[in-house]
Amino acid sequence: MELNSLTAISPIDGRYSNSTKLLRNIFSEFGFLKYRLYVEIQWLKKLINMHQILEIKKVEKTDILFLDNIFETFNEEDAISVKNIEKETNHDVKALEYFLRKKLSQSKKLSPFLEFVHFLCTSEDINNIAYALMIKNARDEIILPLWKKIINFLKNASFQYRNNSLLSLTHGQPATPSTMGKEMVNFYYRMQRQYHKLKKIEILGKINGTTGNYNAHLVAYPKVNWHAVSKEFITSLGIFWNPYTTQIEPHDYIAELFGCVSLFNNILIDSNRDIWGYISLNYFKQKLIDQEIGSSIMPHKINPIDFENSEGNLGLSNALMNHMINKLPISRWQRDLSDSTVLRNIGVVFAYSIIAYNSVLLGTNKLTINTSQLLKNLDNNWSVLSEAIQTVMRRYTIENAYEKLKKLTRGKKIEKVDIHKFIDKLNIPKIEKERLKKISPSNYIGAASQIIDEIK
């Protein structure tokens, strides 16, 4: 059976392939091979440019272009060649080395230097840098832009709905009113913090040999400062240098990065559930799309499926991330291989998150505010003004203010007239009575509208 979106086992490459196809060039087996090939070539170029390595004679610019072209033209046919070599070697990085050596043998100028391909490197020197570049590209080119779209929706919604008063619910029960805009800005602020944090996380790489001590390096070229060379090479690739490692880069930065992503995802789950609830309360309506069907038997249904889909995929992504956060920083002695199979699933982690982000963006585009329902719920809950009244009473030292409002309102259906009768009987200045009577559930929103102006 040919592999396609219908025959794929995982919905990542099946049902949701349109959302995840951007990841294929990064995290597929082809993508991983190409990133590793890039690292091998860049390291060879670094060695070529080192004047201390006398065995490499002068190389012309055209020869460097030949090297670069091997990477730039790397295609699926080349990847299949590497995999065929791997069938014999049973070692993926060595197979890639042999592939590159074969390519270089076609160059008269470069063929004398075949032994400098993968020179001084353990497989992890290549792999860890490849993963670092893959993660960096996924973060910068895919994840952060999607986060920005979600954050921008929340920011725009904060201003758009800043004056739409909302009956708050604490413990699921009526509470002091807010505005829909203020509720959106709460999520905006939380997600914005994680956005800036993710941008700043240092993605690390190492190239220091079998156990991190440059043993082979110093045997071959004892006068070279390989520690400095390592730093120069790593930072030239646009990532940060880890100077102290075992055979592997310890993956702490991956755990840190996934901690940030999983927290963002949890905030988004919180937002999804709140918006889902507001749809259920009819505070938000969903735009009707004639061709769509909400239920196979109930024709009237318009379900909040985008927010539900997002929540489910965020949960899957977080479950895998939490395993990686706990697993990846731990390796026996100078290394064991248990991280290898886990690292190959980094693309899966990002894929589930990306499916969720795209889904929630679909959902937010269908939302319209239902002002009449918001006001109706507020007008049915005059008891929420008990907080304001008892606070003013306490200001004027009226004894048992809280208890008196509790007796009036708790567990009872209170109307506007009941509140005003109670205010009339209070022993407070007339001007305060008039001020209290001007308060209603829809305008008792504190500074909810104003503080939105402070967001950036």
UniProtKB/Swiss-Prot annotation:
Glycosyltransferase among keywords: no
GO BP, sorted A to Z: 'de novo' AMP biosynthetic process; 'de novo' IMP biosynthetic process
Protein family per UniProt: Belongs to the lyase 1 family. Adenylosuccinate lyase subfamily.
EC number: 4.3.2.2
Organism: Buchnera aphidicola subsp. Schizaphis graminum (strain Sg)
UniProtKB keywords: Lyase, Purine biosynthesis
Role noted for this protein: Catalyzes two reactions in de novo purine nucleotide biosynthesis. Catalyzes the breakdown of 5-aminoimidazole- (N-succinylocarboxamide) ribotide (SAICAR or 2-[5-amino-1-(5-phospho-beta-D-ribosyl)imidazole-4-carboxamido]succinate) to 5-aminoimidazole-4-carboxamide ribotide (AICAR or 5-amino-1-(5-phospho-beta-D-ribosyl)imidazole-4-carboxamide) and fumarate, and of adenylosuccinate (ADS or N(6)-(1,2-dicarboxyethyl)-AMP) to adenosine monophosphate (AMP) and fumarate.
Residue positions of the active site: H171, S295
Quaternary context: Homotetramer. Residues from neighboring subunits contribute catalytic and substrate-binding residues to each active site.
GO cellular component: cytosol
Catalytic reactions of this protein: N(6)-(1,2-dicarboxyethyl)-AMP = fumarate + AMP; (2S)-2-[5-amino-1-(5-phospho-beta-D-ribosyl)imidazole-4-carboxamido]succinate = 5-amino-1-(5-phospho-beta-D-ribosyl)imidazole-4-carboxamide + fumarate
Name of the top EC class for this enzyme: lyase
MF (Gene Ontology): (S)-2-(5-amino-1-(5-phospho-D-ribosyl)imidazole-4-carboxamido) succinate lyase (fumarate-forming) activity; N6-(1,2-dicarboxyethyl)AMP AMP-lyase (fumarate-forming) activity
Pathway: Purine metabolism; AMP biosynthesis via de novo pathway; AMP from IMP: step 2/2; Purine metabolism; IMP biosynthesis via de novo pathway; 5-amino-1-(5-phospho-D-ribosyl)imidazole-4-carboxamide from 5-amino-1-(5-phospho-D-ribosyl)imidazole-4-carboxylate: step 2/2
Protein name: Adenylosuccinate lyase
